[in-house]
Amino acid sequence: MAEFRIREKNLLGRGQELAFSTTLAGERTEFDLSFTEPYFLDRDLSAGIDLFRITRNQDELAYDLERTGAGLRVGYPVAKDMRQTLGYRFENNDIQDVDADASFFIRAQEGERSTSAVSQSLVYDTRDSIIEPTEGLITRLETEVAGVGGDAQYVQNRLGANYFYPIKDQWIVSLLGETGYVFGYGDEDVQINERFYLGGSTLRGFERSGVGPRDISTNDSLGGNAFYRGSVELSMPSGLPEDLGIKTHVFTDFGSLFEVDDSGANIEDEHSVRLSVGGGLSWRSPLGPIRVDVATPVLEEDYDEDELFRFSFGTSF
């Protein structure tokens, strides 16, 4: 994978932010360009625009997804450590190159579909660091409503929190919880690319999209309209020199993904909890946090897909 990022936080000496990033990997290609004015109209009001194009070759989902779009956003403080962001997004989604032997429920959704959506995000954040927090709390409530034009008609809600507590010097306990639900309205069902997916970095010990509703006749993951997940993690010194920025982690993850609008004898959709345990190492690199985790499932369904090793870049919440 090759990743390239440029961020100028004081464009032309006016405090404006311009960011460009591109990711080239075997399974996805991403281009993102964003501009933010932090003091729009000389007020504590941020305004921004985002442009993006994302192509994902999703072998585990039996189809490729191409997303092209743009968004506008405005953010403002509502209380100490609390900020509200309002946004609008328009994008074109193209489900393409569907495998010939893919699930009927996937093949039926092949083609282009536009999404026009308004959103809000309310964030409360008291963490001492965005990159490597040792104490504090971040909570996030997000709502997106699609149907202001476009083809998609759905309402998506997400609520999550992550709490960090130092039990002694460099020994940090973190607790994470998140849940979400999406539903269609009018005559529209929730489409496969609008659902939630669980696994990989969101539920270690399981493959990306390895948990949740599945067409067992083709072994294709279908995503779910509802999910919950949680994690308990202990971070501690690795025993190596502190200036290397390497830490050790032990954790347990749990969660579940369920509910699809499709129905049929071949769809497995259990609401049962999945649970895994594991450990890993993280490195505070100049480019951001890099982690290697090893995890194994303790509770799972027969049709779930396991994953032993997971490499990740960046923060998890």
Language-model features: where?
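C-terminal structured "cap/appendage" subdomains that terminate the fold
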Residues: 257-305, 309
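Gram-negative/organellar outer-membrane beta-barrel architecture
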Residues: 1-138, 203-205, 209-220, 225, ...
